[in-house]
Design a protein with these regions (language model features):
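Non-catalytic substrate/cofactor recognition surfaces at enzyme active-site rims
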Residues: 1-208
């Protein structure tokens, strides 16, 4: 019977780093291609430095985080109302306020206004587990990498692996500051990414 090392590669979502042939702008298409090639290079470098898992045993934990679906803060509603007013006249006018794409900007701005003040929430499932001396967290949404960097820096494990999905954007405070389209389009309020990061550090400590 042969034995060897099992290598698992988890590729989550962290922004547009794919080689996207559908991007119309040649400048942007080349930029995405460059990012994709760089990321592939980083993966190869990481694979060359693999280490066997130390320690033993498996431990898991799970928690449900209640996220607020409300953007009625910091002048956001006023901005959304401006976008709706502009887009009623010109469907591409959303770009003037940095709302990404004109047509989707109109829809998202209307959605923000509808949700504001309703006190809506959405449950987010959080998982953390340990395999040997490795710590893992798993989340089904696209939490910005700022939060992932914080989790790794504060994790009790020397190596922490974050398995990420793309169910919805959970933008970091920095993304909200520079009006990222993910922040505008995402469902959750500002501060959600940072709260999740803190909670994940707690879960990792629980499985240490």
């Amino acid at each position: 019977m042969q034995t060897g090392m099992l290598c698992a590669y988890f590729n989550g979502a962290s922004g547009n780093q794919n080689q996207d042939s559908e991007v119309k702008s040649e400048k942007h298409r080349l930029m995405y291609n460059e990012y994709g090639v760089k990321m592939a290079g980083y993966v190869v470098e990481t694979l060359a430095d693999l280490k066997e898992i130390g320690g033993s045993g498996i431990k898991t934990t799970h928690e449900t985080f209640v996220g607020n679906v409300d953007h009625s803060w910091d002048g956001f509603i006023t901005q959304a109302e401006e976008v709706v007013a502009l887009c009623e006249k010109d469907k591409t006018a959303g770009k003037q306020l940095g709302y990404g794409y004109g047509f989707s900007s109109h829809l998202h701005a209307k959605s923000i206004i509808t949700r504001a003040g309703l006190g809506l929430t959405k449950n987010l499932e959080m998982y953390a587990f340990r395999i040997g001396d490795l710590g893992f967290i798993s989340e089904s949404y696209e939490m910005f990498s700022d939060a992932g960097i914080y989790i790794r820096a504060n994790s009790p494990f020397e190596t922490t692996i974050i398995i990420s999905g793309n169910h919805d954007y959970i933008a970091s405070a920095e993304a909200f500051d520079y009006r990222s389209y993910e922040a505008d389009c995402g469902m959750f309020e500002r501060g959600t990414a940072e709260k999740l990061a803190e909670k994940y550090v707690e879960l990792l400590k629980a499985v240490q």
